[in-house]
Amino acid sequence: SRNQSTVNLVAAKARVGSSPDEILLSLADEQVCDNIEVSNDLVDKLLLRFKDDWKSALGVFRWAGLRPGYKHRPEAYDMMVDILGKMKQMDQMRELLEEMNRNHLVTLNTVGKAMRRFSGAGKWEDAVRMFDELGTFGLEKNAESMNLLLDTLCKEGKVEQARAIFLELKSHILPNAHTFNIFIHGWCKANLVDEAHWTLQEMKGHAFRPCVISYSTIILFYCRQHNFSKVYELLDEMEAQGCPPNVVTYTTIIVFLAKSQNTEEALQLTQRMKSAGCKPDTPFFNSLIYILGRAGRFQEAVDVFEKEMPNAGVSRDTSTYNSMIAMLCHHGHVSKALSLLREMETSAPFKLDGQTFYPLLKSCLRTGDMNLLSQLLDDMVKKHQLSLDRSAYALLIHGLCRANKCQWAYHLFEEMISKDIVPKYQTCHMLLEEVKLKSMYDTAEKIEDFMK
């Protein structure tokens, strides 16, 4: 589209220069850029393009800000703050915040992004300082802004510091239920589950009823520890407190039980969920299909897909189809898997991804169906605009070497390198051995040069 070609044009010019100022000058000097009408959409797309390249992002941001008839929205400033913070350019981020403040553009969203980036860069004291200076941004210290700070600290593993700050603030800022849920999450993240339980009691002391999120956070902690007796205790407590677990809680437990090889127990819990009147959703059924497939209960998984989901009025998503395709391929039903792929292609809402195709590619390599392999790769790239990642290239190169298709494998190897995807040592080594066996000495030399 025209919009996309404008993005590509500016992006190409924005890569010239070693500093934001140089990039700004190179864009300002470009006659072709003078005719571009800058819009919010264009700026958003450019910032997204340069989310990992702060110099180009800031150069483009400054250039757009100087264009006649255009003024940055607060959202564009927030994106820029986030990019600078993510790339640990804290001085530049502070300067931008000061500029925003002069123009009265700082919102709580801005503050949240800046706090998170300060904490992520190990500067949690700066996040606290930002909260202390909220008044200078024309913002209030209230439960919402306090929660932002506490959440930021807890997510960076600073729950003790968050607690000390909360004890200082709670005399003049009233906490809400979310405040306590933040701490429950923070204590669990720090492996201090007793404190999380204690926070449940503290919550009740403040006249807040623990909700599904409060309990589910602790349940997730116990699931990760494979402490399922505690999980069941909490499920009983939730029901006794009139706060029944929801489908997300059940799905989490079921997945962890299956991962711990407790498949039967996981399936029993699905029955408990249904008996409790808890309605299944798409992620629940996706997990169930995956678990049944892994347990070798092929027909039951097919029944869930073909009968249970439609009967429950639950729609399928990409993940549902991906699980089914992987399972069908694993059991050698490639034609059925292909018909599901075609069904996805003709049904509107589905966005196919790499996971849709990889089991099929693997099956082609296993059965030696090179025509189908070629067609699938063609569909991936041309029909669905999907690109292969390092593991997909490795799968193909290894498989093609085993299938005696060295020339094709080497072609993919070259394609991979041209895209700046660095192959693993094993991939290079295997390809090298195979081409030597075929007396492809020129090719072998090129691979050896690359491996140096």
Predicted regions and their residues:
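N-terminal targeting peptides
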Residues: 1-144, 156-161, 178, 192, ...
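Pentatricopeptide repeat
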Residues: 39-43, 73, 77, 93, ...
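Alpha-helical solenoid repeat scaffolds, predominantly canonical TPR units
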Residues: 60, 96, 130, 165, ...
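The canonical alpha-helical register within tetratricopeptide repeats
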Residues: 63, 99, 133, 168, ...
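Inter-helix linker motif
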Residues: 68-69, 103-104, 122, 138, ...
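C-terminal interaction modules of eukaryotic adaptor/scaffold proteins
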Residues: 402-452
